[in-house]
Amino acid sequence: MKVWIDVLTPKQANFFSVFVARLREHGHDIFVTTRKYREVEQLLQIRNTNATVIGRHGGADLSAKLVESSKRIADLAEHVTKKKPDLAISFCSPEAARVAYGLGVPHYAICDSPHAEAVCRLTIPLSRKLFTPRAVPKSAWKRYGIASPNIARYNALDPAAWIHAYAPG
C-alpha cells in the first residue's frame, strides 16, 4: 500500500518516524511531506526519515496563515497527484486533509487535542477515521461531525510511540 504522511511539528516528527519505520517493515511504500520548519527537518534527518519540504507556516498573522496554507494546498495537490497514494495520514494537518479529500484519497487523522478547534474543524470532517488516546473521551470529538464508530482509541499517550526506543544512557 502506498501511504502519504504529512508531518508539521517536532512531536509529529518523533511520532511519525517510528510509525514510518514500522509501516516500511510491513512492506508499505511511504512518502513523507513536511513544511519548512528547521526543528522538524532536523529531527526527521536525525531519525533517517526522508521528507519533501512543501510550503511554510504563515506565522501569527491570520491572513498570512491563510495565504501560506492555500499555497501549500496547491503545491501538495500537485505533488500528491504524481505520487498516487492509497491513503493519507496526518496529525490533523489541515492541508493534508484538504488535499486528500479533494483527490479522493482516504485521510486518517491522529489527534489528542480536541481543544484545537480551528484545526479540528478543518480536518476531522474530512477524515475517514480518527485515532486518539483513550484518555480523550469520544464525546470530545462529536462536535466536529465524526461518528463514534469512526473514532479509534488507543491505550497510550503519543510520546509512548517513540520513548520506548531510547534506553537510558
Question: What is the predicted role of each segment?
Answer:
Residues 24-68:
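Conserved nucleotide-sugar phosphate-binding/catalytic loop shared by glycosyltransferases and other
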